[in-house]
């Protein structure tokens, strides 16, 4: 059985600058630890600078296609050649704003793995879905799209991030107990197909995580770290969150 390792990932979305890359990399290099993986996901123009700074780096999306006539898209192989290690797939903003379906997300997941990138599969329900008791149904469908395309074994070389859409950038956060319940559902679902894989799978929580709530969230049995939005743009906040993840897995 593979041992899980805590991870704190920062999604900069369409924010950041070369100066912020320097500030954040200096801060992160001071808190690096064998206990946790720290990864930043800057916008594409900052990826090379982030990699050069020595911080583990990923991209916020990737094309599901191989190279060709796809203006504005970026191929997974090129991302790999730059030296990035991770890619986000299925973030709720990609699903809602750019209408990426579960099938498209699964195709992006597959393309990332094909070239040796580690996909972080983002899953989560909207506020109305949560209010109507559909959280598990929605999350299961998002995971099943990948399993049906690639088989459960593909999840071995991936990370899952549970981000309830109603908590992203809203200041609302799932309680530690709410988040743990969904994380346990995800792990149990995968364990029903492959127990060892499920126990070794890193599952992150995202949704208005900050230095004040991260410790309680990360203390939950099935929460292995966080996918951080706004707080990943502030060195003090992000490093405090990273420190709170040490020793929790």
UniProtKB/Swiss-Prot annotation:
Its EC number is 5.3.1.1. CDD domains: TIM. Keywords: Cytoplasm, Gluconeogenesis, Glycolysis, Isomerase. One of its GO terms (cellular component) is cytosol. InterPro entries: Aldolase_TIM, TIM_sf, TrioseP_Isoase_bac/euk, Triosephosphate_isomerase, Triosephosphate_isomerase_AS. The keyword Isomerase applies. It is found in: Cytoplasm. One of its GO terms (biological process) is glycerol catabolic process. It comes from the Bacteria. Substrate binds at residues 11-13, 169, 208, 229-230. It is an enzyme of class 5 (isomerase). Pathway: Carbohydrate biosynthesis; gluconeogenesis; Carbohydrate degradation; glycolysis; D-glyceraldehyde 3-phosphate from glycerone phosphate: step 1/1. The active site is at residues 91, 163. GO terms for molecular function: triose-phosphate isomerase activity. Gene3D superfamilies: Aldolase class I (3.20.20.70). It catalyses: D-glyceraldehyde 3-phosphate = dihydroxyacetone phosphate. Homodimer. PANTHER family: TRIOSEPHOSPHATE ISOMERASE. Involved in the gluconeogenesis. Catalyzes stereospecifically the conversion of dihydroxyacetone phosphate (DHAP) to D-glyceraldehyde-3-phosphate (G3P). Belongs to the triosephosphate isomerase family. This is Triosephosphate isomerase.
